[in-house]
UniProtKB/Swiss-Prot annotation:
The modification Lysine amide is found at residue 97. InterPro entries: SVWC_dom. Expressed by the venom gland. This is La1-like protein 13. Belongs to the scorpion La1-like peptide family. It comes from Urodacus yaschenkoi (Inland robust scorpion). GO terms for cellular component: extracellular region. Keywords: Amidation, Disulfide bond, Secreted, Signal. The keyword Disulfide bond applies. The keyword ATP-binding does not apply.
Length: 98
């Protein structure tokens, strides 16, 4: 029985070790006060910014997405997004007549 358990236990450890490396287990990206685990995303509602931490061949990248800069046109006005809304609904919009 012990002969069977040792290889099985070793195989389980190898699989768990490999899966944690592939998933970036325990790894994270930092954006100011935000710590984003690999494979997850967080929203900074104070700046309406989306942070996503990705694993590209064991190289971690912090992807940052924020609201576009709007160039005002005549006959249009800026409407702020809802401060508590998730990204991108928190971004301001341009409302134009006609």
């Amino acid at each position: 029985m012990e002969r069977i358990l040792k290889p099985v236990f070793l195989a389980i450890l190898i699989v768990l070790s490999f899966s944690s490396q592939c998933m970036g287990f325990g790894e994270s990206c930092q954006a100011g006060k935000h710590i984003v685990p690999v494979g997850q995303q967080q929203i900074d509602s104070s700046t309406c910014t989306l942070y996503k931490c990705s694993n590209y061949n064991r190289k971690y990248a912090l992807e940052t997405t924020s609201c576009a800069t709007l160039k005002m046109k005549s006959g249009c006005r800026m409407v702020p997004g809802a401060a508590t809304a998730p990204f991108p609904n928190c971004c301001p919009m341009m409302m134009c007549k006609g």
